[in-house]
Amino acid sequence: EAKGAAEHESAEQAQPQQAAPAAAPAGATPVNPKDDGFWGNTITVINNFADKVLNLTLKDVKIDVSDTGDQYDWDQKGKAALSVQGKGNVEIELDGDNELKSGTQSAGLEKTSTGTLTLKDDSKEAGSLTATGGNNAAGIGGGFQGNGENITITGGTVIATGGFSAAGIGGGREGKGENITITGGTVNATSNDGAGIGGGLLGSGENIAITGGTVNATGTDGAGIGGGNGGVGKNITITGGTVTAAGGFGNAGIGGGNGSDGENITITGGSVTATGGEFAAGIGGSNGGSGNNITITGGTVTATGGEGGAGIGGGAEGGGGNNITIKGGTVTATGGGNRGNSGAGIGGGSSGSGENITINDGKVTATGGNYAAGIGGGSVGAWGGDAGSGKNITINGGTVNATGDGGAGIGGGGAAASDIELWGSNGGNGEDITINGGTVNAAGAYGGAGIGGGLNGIGSKVTVSGAAQVTATATASRDPDWPHTDTGATIGNGSTRTPDGESVDGKEIQADISGLTTGWIHHIIYNPLLNWDDEPDTILKEWWEFALPKPPKEDKGFNVDALKGTPEPTLDLHVETLKGVPLPFNTRQQGSTLRVTSDNLAARLHGTRHALEALQEHGVEQIEFVTTFKTTTLSVADLLAEGGSWFALEHDGFVSRQLSAAQAESLKCELHS
C-alpha cells in the first residue's frame, strides 16, 4: 500500500509511476501484477491538515482490485483502488490514461475525507481517469452507505461508473451526493440504481453545479443528475457547458429519483438536454414527484418527459409543476405519453397540475403529450384521477408556442370520454391566465381550448393586456374513432364529450382586455379532415379582438378649418372598429392628400358624400388611410363617381377592402338605424 501523507508543515506529493511491466510507487512493491498491466496495489491518500492542499499526480496508473470482497456478504468489504481521507483538500493531476477498479462496496476512487477532492488536467500532457465502483459503491465518491461530497472536476476526461445501487459520481448505496462541481473537461457518469451524478439508491443529490465542460450523466433507475432511486434532487445549477442528462425508469433527467421531487433547479446558460425515464419529467419530478422552483434564465434547454412526465415540471401520477420561471434562453419542453397518461410540456405530469408558471422572456416551445396541455395540467393518469389544472400562468414577454393535444394550449389537461366512463374523471380547468406582453401562440386540439380548459374542462379568468399579440386556436377532433368534430373554445372551455357519444363545443368566454394597448387576440377555429394524410387544416371560423377604443375626441369628425381656415361645418368623416365602435384618429393635409391615421391593426374609415365634396372643394384629391400594418390611398373623384351617400374602407391586419357604394349604404343602415 502506497501512502501520500501530509503529516508535517508542508504537504508531500505522492506520484505513482508505471514502468515495464508495472513499476510500483516509491517505497512500495507491486502486489499480484497482472498480465493486462493492472496492479493489485491500492493507494491511500491522507491529508489531515485542513489548511493544506496535498497535490498528487496519477500518470498511467492502473489498479484492479475488483475481485476483492463478497457481494453477498456486506460485512466483507472489498478494497478501494484509490482512497482519499482526512480533513484537508487533495488535488489530483491526471496525466496519461488511468484506470481504477474497486472491490465490492468500495468506490473506484473512494472519498471519505471532509476536504475537497479536485480532479484536474493542468499539465500539457492530456490525462484521463476511468473509475469503476464495486457493488453498492460509486465510481467516484462514497462506498456502501457512504456520501460522495465536496468533489470538483476542472479538466481531463473522467469516466465514472457506479456499481449496482450507487451513483456514477456521488453517493454509494443509501448515500447522498452533495457539493459536486464540474467546471471543465469531459465527464461521463453512469449509474445502476443511483444517479449518474448525485445520490445512490435512496440517496439525495444536492448542491450540484456545472459551469463548463461536456457532461454526460445517465441514471439507470436513478436521475441523470439529482437523486438516486427514491432520493430527492435539489439545488442543481447549470451556468455553462454542454450537459446531457438521462434518467432511468421512473427517474427525472435532472431532478428527483423515483418517487421523489426535483426542486430548486436553475439553468442560466449552456446547452442542456434532459430526458426523463418512463413516468418522469425531463427536468423536475420523478414518478409521483413534483418539480418545484425551476428557473431558466438563459442557454438552450431541451427537456423531454417520459410517458406521463412533463417536459419541465412534474412526474406521472400526480406530480405537479409548481413555481416555474423562464426569463430567457431557448426552451423546448415536450411532455411524454400517448393515448392518455401524459405530461404537459411545462407543468404537471399525468393527473398533476401546473401552477405559478411565469414566462418573462425567451423563446419557449411547449408541447403536451396526448390529452395534456402545452403549458399547464397533465392528462388523466394511468390509474385514473382527474386531469391536472393550469392555474396562475403569467406571460410577460418573449415568444411562446404552446400546443395541447386534448389538453389546452395553455391551461388544463383533458379527460377523454373513456376516462369519464372508466374512472369518473374530470377534465382539467384553466384559470387565472394572464398575458401581459410578448407573442403567444396557444393551440388546443381534440377538444382542448387554445387557452382555458382541456377536454371536459372549464376555462376562466383570462386576461390579455399591454402589447401582447395572442393567437388562440382550437382544432376540431380529427380522431376517426370519435363520431363528431367538436372543438374546444379558442379562449374558454374545452369541448364536452360523454361516454354515450354526445359532444358539445367548448363555450367561448370573453377575456379581460381592458388593459390591452397596442396588442390583439386572433381567434381561429380549424376544421381538419379526418384523413391524417390529407390536405392541411382549413379555417372554419376566424375573428380578431383589439384594444378597446379610448374615449373619442370631443370632435371625432374632420373640420375643414384644418385645411384652409374657411369656416365650415364639421365633416362626417369617422374611424371605427369593424363592429362600429368609435376609434381615435388623426388627420393631416399634405398638399392635395389628406392623411387619416389610426393606431390600430383593424379599423374602418367611412364618411359621407358631403364630406367628399367639401374636401374636393378645398383642394383634397386623395385620402390616405393609415393603420398599423396597412396604407391605402383613395381618389376623391373616383369615390364621388361611384355615387351613393356613404363610402367605407376596411383594414383587417394586412388586408384592405373597399366597400362599394351599395355596401356602404347597407353598412350605414346597419350602423345608424
Regions found by a protein language model. Name each.
Residues 1-555:
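A composition-driven surface/loop motif
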Residues 20-26, 32-46, 52-78, 85, ...:
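Long, contiguous ectodomains of secretory-pathway proteins
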